[in-house]
């Protein structure tokens, strides 16, 4: 699933479409997580004037309307020319003045929706702060983790706590600060929380700089792969040696997600604070 760095990179790669007018819209398959709106043709004649990201949503601002785009598990956008070969799972084609924008999604868990009061309230307003914003700091995170008994990794992946810290980047951040992913979130000391916040920000910034992580088939709208996966120290490395102590990395499931960790560098402390 694309995480925050991949969505940010995708958004940036769509910038060539800014200030271009929509000439036509073709819906080849409306059946995504939620159906593509019947009135999506309203975009015709409007210019794309803004692209922003909130959590894993791309917010596309047109002259009269706004749209909310989510890549789901396997979605991607691609900038194409009209004569480029169509792929089986190209579900939406928006023809701009100079290029086509195609939405491709084999598993169809993504969404293409209008951004309106209903979707704003349902999908946006309940989200936690952006991890790279000044709103995400140690004091804030400590207040959200207080008395939580769930594992810290599960807490970090809760979009009500902080957005966009998915499996890859939570795994790497916890490895780098030596915290076991199953450690009860409420047990972390303030010093650990401070280090964790700094590391989350560093990891995400680095991943964005490297174009995200291409683990299976992710690429941005220009067809370019990311390279952060080449720097991974824990994620996807179960049964390999820890780069720090040469202990064999282990894997456990937390919240239905694989969590790789080093039992030596990330010991699980079982006693909770009084």
From Swiss-Prot:
Active-site residues (renumbered): 2 (schiff-base intermediate with dna), 3 (proton donor), 56 (proton donor), 257 (proton donor)
Name this polypeptide is given: Formamidopyrimidine-DNA glycosylase
Residues where DNA binds: 89, 107, 148
Summary of subunit composition and partner proteins: Monomer.
Cofactor note: Binds 1 zinc ion per subunit.
Function, in words: Involved in base excision repair of DNA damaged by oxidation or by mutagenic agents. Acts as a DNA glycosylase that recognizes and removes damaged bases. Has a preference for oxidized purines, such as 7,8-dihydro-8-oxoguanine (8-oxoG). Has AP (apurinic/apyrimidinic) lyase activity and introduces nicks in the DNA strand. Cleaves the DNA backbone by beta-delta elimination to generate a single-strand break at the site of the removed base with both 3'- and 5'-phosphates.
Reactions it catalyzes: Hydrolysis of DNA containing ring-opened 7-methylguanine residues, releasing 2,6-diamino-4-hydroxy-5-(N-methyl)formamidopyrimidine; 2'-deoxyribonucleotide-(2'-deoxyribose 5'-phosphate)-2'-deoxyribonucleotide-DNA = a 3'-end 2'-deoxyribonucleotide-(2,3-dehydro-2,3-deoxyribose 5'-phosphate)-DNA + a 5'-end 5'-phospho-2'-deoxyribonucleoside-DNA + H(+)
UniProt keywords, alphabetically: DNA damage, DNA repair, DNA-binding, Glycosidase, Hydrolase, Lyase, Metal-binding, Multifunctional enzyme, Zinc, Zinc-finger
Keyword Transcription regulation part of the UniProt annotation: no
InterPro entries for this protein: DNA_glyclase/AP_lyase_DNA-bd, Formamido-pyr_DNA_Glyclase, FPG_cat, MutM-like_N-ter, Ribosomal_uS13-like_H2TH, Znf_DNA_glyclase/AP_lyase, Znf_FPG/IleRS
ZnF (FPG-type) residues: 233-267
Protein species of origin: Acinetobacter baumannii (strain SDF)
Cell membrane keyword on record: no
């Amino acid at each position: 699933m694309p995480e925050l760095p991949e969505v940010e990179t995708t958004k940036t790669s769509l910038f060539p479409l800014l200030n271009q007018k929509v000439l036509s819209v073709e819906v080849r398959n409306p059946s995504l997580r939620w159906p593509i709106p019947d009135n999506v043709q309203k975009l015709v004649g409007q210019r794309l004037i803004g692209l922003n990201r909130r959590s894993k949503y791309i917010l596309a601002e047109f002259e009269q309307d706004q749209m909310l785009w989510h890549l789901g598990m396997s979605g991607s956008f691609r900038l194409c020319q009209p004569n480029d070969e169509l792929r089986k799972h190209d579900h939406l084609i928006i023809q701009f003045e100079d290029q086509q924008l195609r939405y491709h999604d084999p598993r169809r868990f993504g969404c293409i929706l209008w951004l309106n009061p209903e979707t704003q309230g349902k999908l946006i307003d309940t989200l936690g702060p952006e991890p790279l914003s000044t709103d995400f700091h140690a004091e804030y995170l400590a207040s959200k983790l207080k008395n939580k008994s769930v594992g810290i990794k599960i807490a970090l992946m809760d979009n009500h706590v902080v957005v966009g810290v998915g499996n890859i980047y939570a795994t790497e951040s916890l490895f780098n600060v030596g915290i076991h992913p199953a450690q009860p979130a409420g047990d972390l000391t303030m010093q650990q929380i401070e280090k964790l916040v700094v590391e989350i920000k560093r990891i995400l910034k680095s991943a964005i700089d490297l174009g995200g992580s291409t683990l299976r088939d992710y690429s941005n709208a220009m067809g370019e792969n990311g390279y952060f996966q080449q720097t991974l120290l824990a994620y996807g490395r179960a049964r390999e040696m820890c780069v720090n102590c040469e202990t064999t990395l282990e894997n456990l499931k937390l919240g239905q997600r694989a969590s790789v960790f080093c039992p030596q560098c990330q010991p699980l402390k079982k006693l909770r604070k009084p």
